[in-house]
């Protein structure tokens, strides 16, 4: 999975630099951002890597667990991407994010992830970053995981990934998580950093 993550990160940067067939589209309103940076490009690039490597996967996969994220009736939520083992059980759950979403987006996704009993990837695309950006995002990750860790099923690997397009950097942190056991991420310095 690490090579696939690396390839997706490289291709995202190439999309941003218009050196790939997939590009980030332009905004046509008076947005201060010129390009729309979203998780959709990551979803396509991961899908391409899975197809190229003959890895079974699905998109927008219903969760087995029920969640009440809107309305009054608990329902299945959706994972952005899931890869499968040969026996058709989940291998990796992948949740995609971009920019700096509200805290509730973190807790909503971590709620799904802790209940899935499999390995998980949090893949986050940023146009740019500084220490303050990472401090804010890491705080949201810590809060989101801490709120849900008591419900964690099993003992699994989680990968927290940041791709910073303009700086051409990939940040990776591998965590082993289980119920009631989570050591807070202290800073971006804990992550492996790779120049792309």
Which role does the model predict for each range below?
Residues 1-52:
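Interdomain/boundary linker segments immediately adjacent to catalytic/signaling cores
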Residues 12-20, 46-54, 113-117, 138-153:
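Hydrophobic, Leu/Ile/Phe/Ala-enriched alpha-helical segments that form helix-helix packing faces
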Residues 34-35, 56-88:
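Active-site metal-binding core of divalent-cation-utilizing nuclease and nuclease-like domains
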Residues 39-41, 60-64, 95:
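Acidic-residue sensor for enzyme active/binding pockets
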Residues 42, 79, 92:
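Residue-level detector of short, conserved catalytic/binding motifs and their immediate flanks
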Residues 57, 118-121, 160:
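Hydrophobic anchor at the start of a short beta-strand
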Residues 89-148:
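Catalytic cores of nucleic-acid endonucleases
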Residues 127-196:
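Domain-level recognition of nuclease-like catalytic cores that cleave nucleotide substrates
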